[in-house]
C-alpha cells in the first residue's frame, strides 16, 4: 500500500516538473524571438531609408509582387463616375538584411505591427479619390518577416476610385472600372512591381451589387514615362454589366404604358373636349417628369444615350397624341362652319328659285287697261326672242367629272364614307400610332442589342 502511494507521488512530481519545463521553454522561445528582432532591427543595424538590393544581392531593382483580395464593392455611381471598393492589399519583397536563424524550423516568421520599422515600397493608387485604413478594434495591418528575408505586408483599406464611363448604350451598357497602382518616387531602375504568380486577384464569393454584375477582371501593366523617368505601374480592370431588369421595370414599361394611355383619346368622342385635353396634358406632364427624373440620376454628357432616344420618342408620341386632338378639333369646327355655310347657301338658292318662279308666273299673266285678265299663248313662235331667253334660263349646266384623288379613295375605305374629316383623322390615328410605335421598338431594340453584342 505504501509503495503505491510512493509511485503516485513520484508521477505527480514528474508532471509538475514537465509543465514547468514547458513553460520555461515557451518563455525562452519568446525571448529568442525578441532577441532575433533586436538583432535584425536594432539601433544602428537596419536603415529603413535604404531600399533593399536586387535579386541575389545585385544592384538591380527591388522586385515587389502584388496581390489583392476584393472583399466588397459598395457603390458604383453613374453621376460621379466613381466606385467604392474594400480590399485586402498585399505586397511581398525580399530584403537580404532581414534574414535570421529559424531556430531549427521552430520560428516560421516574425510579426510586426509598425510598418515604419522596415523599408516599404512607395506605392500609391493613381486613380484614387478617397481612401482610409481600418483601425477597429486594432489597426488592420501586419508585416511578416520570414527567415529567408522575405517580407509580407498586408493591410485592409477602403477606396473610392475614379471610373470614367461611356454611357452611349445606357442602360444596355458595360463599364470597365480600373484600379491602378504605381510607384511615386522610385523609377524602374530601383523598383519594379509585378503581379503575384498564380491568381493575383481574388474576389469574395457571392459578391452582390444592386445594379451591376461583375463579369470578369483582367490584370495588366501600365508603366508610365515622365520627364523624371519611367515608373512601374500595375492595373486590374473590373468589367461590370448593368442589370437591365431594374431599368425595364422602372423606365421602359412605365413609358410604354404612358404612350398607350395617350392613345385612349383617339377612342373618345371628338366633342369630349375636357376629357381629351386633360388626358393629353396629364400624360405629357407625367412623361416629362419621368424624363427629368431619369436625367437627374445621370451626368450631363455631350452625346445622346440610348435612354435619351427612348424617352425622346415616347415624349414625341405623347405630344403627337395631343396635337392630333388639336387637329381633330380644328377639322370638326371647320366642318361645322362649312356645313352652316352650305345650309345658308341652299336657303339662298331656294329663295332665289322661289322668286324666279314668281317672276315667271307673273310674266304668264297680263292685265289690260279695262282690268280684265287674259291668258297669253303658252306656245310661242320658235323665233321669238323672249322664248329663247326663257329656255336659256331653264337650262341646267353640269360640271365635268373631276379626276379621282388617290388619298380620298384610300380614306373612303374606312367606315362611314359620309363621316366627317375629323372622325377619319381619329380612325387613322388609331391604326397609325400603334404601327409606328411598334416599328420604332423593332428598330430600337435590334440596334442597341446588336451594338451591345458587338461590345462584348
From Swiss-Prot:
Activity control mechanisms:
Glutamate binding triggers a rapidly reversible current, while the anti-helmintic drug ivermectin triggers a permanently open channel configuration. Inhibited by picrotoxin.
Is-annotated flag, keyword Transport? yes
Q: Which residues lie on this side of the membrane: Extracellular?
A: 23-245, 296-302, 451-456
Q: Which ranges does the record list as Cytoplasmic topological domains?
A: 269-273, 324-426
InterPro entries associated with the record: GABAA/Glycine_rcpt (IPR006028), GluCl_TM (IPR044721), Neur_chan_lig-bd (IPR006202), Neur_chan_lig-bd_sf (IPR036734), Neur_channel (IPR006201), Neuro-gated_channel_TM_sf (IPR036719), Neuro_actylchol_rec (IPR038050), Neurotrans-gated_channel_TM (IPR006029)
List GO BP terms, alphabetically.
chloride transmembrane transport; chloride transport
Disulfide bond residue pairs: 163-177, 222-233
How does it sit in the bilayer?
Answer: Multi-pass membrane protein
UniProt keyword list = Cell membrane, Chloride, Chloride channel, Disulfide bond, Ion channel, Ion transport, Ligand-gated ion channel, Membrane, Postsynaptic cell membrane, Receptor, Signal, Synapse, Transmembrane, Transmembrane helix, Transport
Key word Metal-binding present: no
Signal peptide: which range, if any? 1-22
Where is it made, tissue-wise?
A: Expressed in the medulla layers (at protein level). Expressed in all major ON pathway medulla neurons (Mi1, Tm3, Mi4, and Mi9) and in OFF pathway neurons (Tm1, Tm2, Tm4, and Tm9).
Task: Give binding positions for L-glutamate.
Answer: 71, 90, 154, 183
* A single MF term (Gene Ontology): transmembrane signaling receptor activity
Any one of the GO CC terms = postsynaptic membrane
Question: Could you give the subunit structure recorded for this chain?
Answer: Pentamer. Homomultimer.
The record's comment on protein family reads: Belongs to the ligand-gated ion channel (TC 1.A.9) family. Glutamate-gated chloride channel (TC 1.A.9.4) subfamily.
Q: Explain the purpose of this protein.
A: Glutamate-gated chloride channel subunit. Together with Gamma-aminobutyric acid receptor Rdl, plays an important role in the visual response by regulating the activity of ON/OFF-selective neurons.
Query: Any miscellaneous information on file?
Result: Channels desensitize rapidly in the continued presence of glutamate and are activated by the glutamate analog ibotenate. In Xenopus oocytes, avermectins and nodulisporic acid directly activate channel conductance.
Protein name as annotated: Glutamate-gated chloride channel
Q: Which organism is it from?
A: Drosophila melanogaster (Fruit fly)
Gene of this entry: GluClalpha
Amino acid at each position: 500500500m505504501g509503495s503505491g502511494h510512493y509511485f503516485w507521488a513520484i508521477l505527480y512530481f514528474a508532471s509538475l516538473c514537465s509543465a514547468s519545463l514547458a513553460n520555461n521553454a515557451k518563455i525562452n522561445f519568446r525571448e529568442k524571438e525578441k532577441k532575433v528582432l533586436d538583432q535584425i532591427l536594432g539601433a544602428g543595424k537596419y536603415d529603413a531609408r535604404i531600399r533593399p538590393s536586387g535579386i541575389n544581392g545585385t544592384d538591380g531593382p527591388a522586385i515587389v509582387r502584388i496581390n489583392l483580395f476584393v472583399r466588397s464593392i459598395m457603390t458604383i455611381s453613374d453621376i460621379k463616375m466613381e466606385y467604392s471598393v474594400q480590399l485586402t492589399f498585399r505586397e511581398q519583397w525580399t530584403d537580404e538584411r532581414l534574414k535570421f536563424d529559424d531556430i531549427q524550423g521552430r520560428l516560421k516568421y516574425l510579426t510586426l505591427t509598425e510598418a515604419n520599422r522596415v523599408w516599404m515600397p512607395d506605392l500609391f493608387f493613381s486613380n484614387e479619390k478617397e481612401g482610409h485604413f481600418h483601425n477597429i478594434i486594432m489597426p488592420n495591418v501586419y508585416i511578416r518577416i520570414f527567415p529567408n528575408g522575405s517580407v509580407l505586408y498586408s493591410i485592409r483599406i477602403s477606396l473610392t476610385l475614379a471610373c470614367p464611363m461611356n454611357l452611349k448604350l445606357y442602360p444596355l451598357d458595360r463599364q470597365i472600372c480600373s484600379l491602378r497602382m504605381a510607384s511615386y518616387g522610385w523609377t524602374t531602375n530601383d523598383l519594379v512591381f509585378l503581379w503575384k504568380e498564380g491568381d493575383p486577384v481574388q474576389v469574395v464569393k457571392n459578391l452582390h451589387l444592386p445594379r451591376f454584375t461583375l463579369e470578369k477582371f483582367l490584370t495588366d501593366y501600365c508603366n508610365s514615362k515622365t520627364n523624371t523617368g519611367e515608373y512601374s505601374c500595375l492595373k486590374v480592370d473590373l468589367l461590370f454589366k448593368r442589370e437591365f431588369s431594374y431599368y425595364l421595370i422602372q423606365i421602359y414599361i412605365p413609358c410604354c404604358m404612358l404612350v398607350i394611355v395617350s392613345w385612349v383619346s383617339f377612342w373618345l368622342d371628338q366633342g369630349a373636349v375636357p376629357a381629351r385635353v386633360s388626358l393629353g396634358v396629364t400624360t405629357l406632364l407625367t412623361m416629362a417628369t419621368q424624363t427629368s427624373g431619369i436625367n437627374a440620376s445621370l451626368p450631363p454628357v455631350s452625346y445622346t444615350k440610348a435612354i435619351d432616344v427612348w424617352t425622346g420618342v415616347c415624349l414625341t408620341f405623347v405630344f403627337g397624341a395631343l396635337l392630333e386632338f388639336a387637329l381633330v378639333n380644328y377639322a370638326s369646327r371647320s366642318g361645322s362652319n362649312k356645313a352652316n355655310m352650305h345650309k345658308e347657301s341652299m336657303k339662298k338658292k331656294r329663295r332665289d328659285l322661289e322668286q324666279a318662279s314668281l317672276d315667271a308666273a307673273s310674266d304668264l299673266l297680263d292685265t289690260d287697261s279695262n282690268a280684265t285678265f287674259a291668258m297669253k299663248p303658252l306656245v310661242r313662235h320658235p323665233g321669238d326672242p323672249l322664248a329663247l331667253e326663257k329656255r336659256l334660263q331653264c337650262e341646267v349646266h353640269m360640271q365635268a367629272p373631276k379626276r379621282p384623288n388617290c388619298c380620298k379613295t384610300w380614306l373612303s375605305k374606312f367606315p362611314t364614307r359620309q363621316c366627317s374629316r375629323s372622325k377619319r383623322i381619329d380612325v387613322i390615328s388609331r391604326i397609325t400610332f400603334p404601327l409606328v410605335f411598334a416599328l420604332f421598338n423593332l428598330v430600337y431594340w435590334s440596334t442597341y442589342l446588336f451594338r451591345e453584342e458587338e461590345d462584348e
